[in-house]
């Protein structure tokens, strides 16, 4: 615990640990396979709050295992290149990769949002014209659609193309079916195995820190933030995503903006590491 105490005394822990927790929360809020698949699965099987907890914790467990493997591998490699002359260069290279990851996430989020806005505008124009030409038929079809596919309200929230495809497939396969707890756990475990830029960021941070205890603590904090979000999403889906969206209009906006905050946070971490690496090289 000595290295952890020193880093805390220097104030580094108060930057990295909250950042890891926030990064985990934001990662869970981002439009992505785990969150969308979980919500679609819970709604399709009409799952209970207990099942939502199970699904969220299972997804977090497998996702955390991947992060642990990546982070521990990074710390193992960092021990092999622990020379003081090499470490600043590793910090600078890590910072460049992190900043590149942040820019890619920001651009991908912006592009996805523009596509979603374009699609929403097209749908609005179509509905507007349809109301004028076939008012009676439109009202009838709309009511019937609402009663037959209540989970379809999810499509009104911002999702990328992969999310919509996965959610639609899950709803078709599991709609109204009874599933066992083992199937729920397996679904959660497999859904959490998808790697993410946040895990890569944790890997590079651990390489920069040269600290096993703090690195492990960061992974734990990231997992805690992710678990909070995934469990909350699962429980929210079990209670009703429709009600959450109806009662708080900011829910959709928050989910849409979360990747921006996440990319900015990753960028700040990369900038912090880059400054330290550059300072070490100049010395």
UniProtKB/Swiss-Prot annotation:
Intervals, Cytoplasmic compartment: 27-51, 107-183, 240-260
Periplasmic side: 1-5, 73-85, 205-218, 282-283
GO molecular function per UniProt: monoatomic cation efflux transmembrane transporter activity; nickel cation transmembrane transporter activity
Annotated compartments: Cell inner membrane
Signal sequence region: none
Positions with biased composition (Basic and acidic residues): 120-148
InterPro entries attached to this UniProt entry: Ni/Co_transpt_high_affinity, NiCoT_RcnA
Stated induction or repression of this protein's expression: By nickel and cobalt. Transcriptionally repressed by RcnR.
BP-aspect Gene Ontology terms: cobalt ion transport; response to cobalt ion; response to nickel cation
Entry GO terms, CC: plasma membrane
Predominant place of localization: membrane
Alphabetical keyword list: Cell inner membrane, Cell membrane, Cobalt, Cobalt transport, Ion transport, Membrane, Nickel, Nickel transport, Transmembrane, Transmembrane helix, Transport
Membrane-traversing stretches: 6-26, 52-72, 86-106, 184-204, 219-239, 261-281
Membrane topology annotation: Multi-pass membrane protein
A UniProt-annotated Pfam family: NicO
Function: Efflux system for nickel and cobalt.
Family: Belongs to the NiCoT transporter (TC 2.A.52) family. RcnA subfamily.
Protein's recorded name: Nickel/cobalt efflux system RcnA
Organism from which the protein derives: Salmonella arizonae (strain ATCC BAA-731 / CDC346-86 / RSK2980)
């Amino acid at each position: 615990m000595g290295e952890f105490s020193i880093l805390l005394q220097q104030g580094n822990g108060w930057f990295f640990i909250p950042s890891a927790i926030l990064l985990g929360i934001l990662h869970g809020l981002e439009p992505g396979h785990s969150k969308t698949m979980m919500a679609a699965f819970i709604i399709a099987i009409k799952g209970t709050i207990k099942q939502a907890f199970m699904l969220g914790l299972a997804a977090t467990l497998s996702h955390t295992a991947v992060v642990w493997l990546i982070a521990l591998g990074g710390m193992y490699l960092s021990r092999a290149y622990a020379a003081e002359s090499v470490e600043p260069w590793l910090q600078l290279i890590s910072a460049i990769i992190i900043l590149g990851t942040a820019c890619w996430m920001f651009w991908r989020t912006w592009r996805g949002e523009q596509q979603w806005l374009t699609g929403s505008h097209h749908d609005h124009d179509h509905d507007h014209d349809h109301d004028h030409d076939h008012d009676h038929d439109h009202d009838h079809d709309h009511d019937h659609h609402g009663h037959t596919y209540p989970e379809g309200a999810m499509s009104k929230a911002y999702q990328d193309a992969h999310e919509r495809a996965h959610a639609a497939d899950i709803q078709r396969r599991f709609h109204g079916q009874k599933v066992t707890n083992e199937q729920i756990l397996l679904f959660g475990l497999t859904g959490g195995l998808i790697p993410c830029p946040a895990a890569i960021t944790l890997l590079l941070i651990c390489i920069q820190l040269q600290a096993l205890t703090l690195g492990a603590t960061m992974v734990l904090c990231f997992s805690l933030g992710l678990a909070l979000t995934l469990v909350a999403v699962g429980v929210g889906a079990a209670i009703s995503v429709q009600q959450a969206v109806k009662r708080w209009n900011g829910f959709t906006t928050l989910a849409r903006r979360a990747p921006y905050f996440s990319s900015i946070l990753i960028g700040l971490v990369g900038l912090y590491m880059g400054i330290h690496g550059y300072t070490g090289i100049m010395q």
